[in-house]
């Protein structure tokens, strides 16, 4: 696939993968993107997952024929983008490997110290002339690994963005970009908002008309939309007005409380209510909803003098991703010593700019008139 005269796509689709990074459900598979920049000299941009080495090398051969690549640029050492380096260098031993010092250290760890015959160690801001095209290397540490580099090609106004602007799904999946890009971002990159903000500031100084990520489609239209979403996500802003309700329930009584709240919110005109049963839903989708909307309600029974395990895991997932700038409401249930609300509130004590609603709902075993009234009051408070 030719993206621009001189820039070609040589990546692969993975239709068989079920769990990405060993935890994220990917029903529509994954794309591992790789590119060739062909000028007077030729540069390969990253490799692909180890299961697709033969297909990837065949893509290179089909495009270049007997010509040998001059460079392979390693922007990111995570194995879904670097695992084929040894096979590549067995085929093209004279090709120079271009990467920063941290990436070469990781390369030694993954492959041993004798992998590369020719190394070109780059620093932040270095350039590499291919002919008419010049590659500019921009370090993007912790987006989302420490060695990450992105690459800008001035002639084509193209940014090779590593894992930035990536998404779940193969390239032939027909779906809205934002949904799976959001789930990917908050699952994998979400902790590193400050680092993404730093990269966006660097990118703002560039004239970009095309973004080539390592996962998902090449972006070449309406870039302001994608960059705007990344700015919102990485600054922990509110993307959409609405309420995410995340709940766990043992015998259905806490679920009934969550459902009543959802009904009341809708009756009051809440623009969106996203319900997540944490025992049954994809946890990454629940995390996605919690970051998408400005308000979150957590509903949990007390269990072993603590929060129900699925809820505890969910709160941990939010906090480790720097959950902030949100309003949280709490619903607890307990038959003799309800303490879940206190525990859930305490879990966010180190989080920034979290506001708890004045109304906290306590259900004593099952809903009654008092707890229903409290739920209705919570709905009104959330809709102010």
Give the predicted meaning of each segment.
Residues 2-5, 99-148, 192-198:
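Metallo-beta-lactamase
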Residues 2-64, 150-153, 157-161, 254:
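Conserved beta-strand hairpin/beta-sheet module of binuclear metal-dependent hydrolase folds
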Residues 40, 51-98:
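Active-site metal-binding motif and surrounding structural segment of the metallo-beta-lactamase
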Residues 45-47, 69-77, 97-100, 159-163, ...:
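Active-site neighborhood of phospho(di)ester-bond hydrolases with catalytic His/Asp-centered motifs
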Residues 84, 282-286:
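Short acidic active-site motifs
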Residues 171-211, 215-218, 260-276, 286-384:
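FMN-binding flavodoxin-like domain, especially the glycine-rich phosphate-binding loop
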Residues 212-239:
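Short N-terminal or domain-adjacent regulatory/targeting segments
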Residues 246-268:
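Short, charged N-terminal beta->alpha structural module
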